[in-house]
């Protein structure tokens, strides 16, 4: 994201071709995937600080999601509206999660079940990483 942003900002173009071949090595454990998500979240915050405009709004959605899961239950103590808002958010998320879990080549119930749980774990890990990134910014600015 940041490299593409700098290339375009300096008048360059991004070349896309379906003839390019590559090998992608995904994380082979859930712990590894969650660590990757956490680090992605952290570096999204740091990159956006040092290269403003390089990250899109979608990169901050997991942080907002995590914060809503923390703040809305607390606010619901003050007014039931926030509890309903949280309920609507969770129903929408679960519905989108279920829909996404059935997409792609996952046809076995076990695979769909795993995907259903991986999406929220990834998003929450990414959000935690974003909070770590915000904390890192605070420490960097103190130096």
Predicted regions: what they are:
Residues 1-55:
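Catalytic donor/gating beta->alpha subdomain of glycosyltransferases that bind UDP-sugars
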Residues 24, 59, 123:
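Histidine-centered active-site/metal-ligand motif
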Residues 55-63:
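Select subsegments of transmembrane alpha-helices in polytopic membrane proteins
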Residues 64-140:
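Membrane-embedded multi-pass helical conduit in multi-pass membrane proteins
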